[in-house]
Amino acid sequence: MSGKLTVITGPMYSGKTTELLSFVEIYKLGKKKVAVFKPKIDSRYHSTMIVSHSGNGVEAHVIERPEEMRKYIEEDTRGVFIDEVQFFSPGLFEVVKDLLDRGIDVFCAGLDLTHKQNPFETTALLLSLADTVIKKKAVCHRCGEYNATLTLKVAGGEEEIDVGGQEKYIAVCRDCYNTLKKRV
């Protein structure tokens, strides 16, 4: 039986990692073998753990290239969990397809759009393959409504790939994005 792909996406501070960690916990409670991965580029909260903004976490294999995942996935692995997929190369798409064909469920979490509202290529590819998409929202940093679907960069230049947290990025709704973008 083929595996299923679940992609959890949305802006920063929307609970993507928290949701990913809840699926890890479900698989562990079901005594299913899991493999958890994060990109080496993201060491914001911990170098060897996936950690949510709220502080919850789980140990993860830290890799640079998607192909490295294969050496950590054993015959009896039932679930693969990948955080911050936007930081991986598009080669992740082929690795995930292979895992699904092997009957392994895959859960991915990551940003769908850059702070300039351009799609992250790897996330977009995974969304095209997904069996289930969980689109998260956040509380808008400006108006306080639970309608933020965008991430606005407020410090640190214009680079689209620039790892950071609250010192660089805020979650905003489209109206507030357009208002604030005129000022930034």
Curated annotation (Swiss-Prot):
Q: Which reaction does it catalyse?
A: thymidine + ATP = dTMP + ADP + H(+)
Give its E.C. classification number.
2.7.1.21
**SUPFAM superfamilies of this UniProt entry?**
Glucocorticoid receptor-like (DNA-binding domain), P-loop containing nucleoside triphosphate hydrolases
Q: Which residues form a coiled coil?
A: none
Q: Does Transport show up as a keyword for this record?
A: no
Sites binding ATP sit at G10, P11, M12, Y13, S14, G15, K16, T17, D83, E84, V85, Q86
Q: Which InterPro entries match?
A: P-loop_NTPase, Thymidine_kinase, Thymidine_kinase_CS
UniProt: Zn(2+) binding residues: C140, C143, C173, C176
Top-level class of the enzyme under EC nomenclature: transferase
Q: Active site: which residues?
A: E84
GO molecular function list: ATP binding; thymidine kinase activity; zinc ion binding
Q: Which GO terms describe its biological process?
A: DNA biosynthetic process; thymidine metabolic process
What highest taxon heads this organism's lineage? Bacteria
> Which Pfam families does the UniProt record give?
TK (PF00265)
Which compartments is it annotated to reside in? Answer: Cytoplasm
Q: Name one GO cellular component term.
A: cytosol
> What are the entry keywords?
ATP-binding, Cytoplasm, DNA synthesis, Kinase, Metal-binding, Nucleotide-binding, Transferase, Zinc
The subunit field of the Swiss-Prot or TrEMBL record says: Homotetramer.
Classification via PANTHER family: THYMIDINE KINASE, THYMIDINE KINASE, CYTOSOLIC
Q: Which family does it belong to?
A: Belongs to the thymidine kinase family.
Instruction: Please identify the protein, giving its name as recorded.
Output: Thymidine kinase
Q: Give the species.
A: Thermotoga sp. (strain RQ2)
Tell me the name of the encoding gene. Answer: tdk
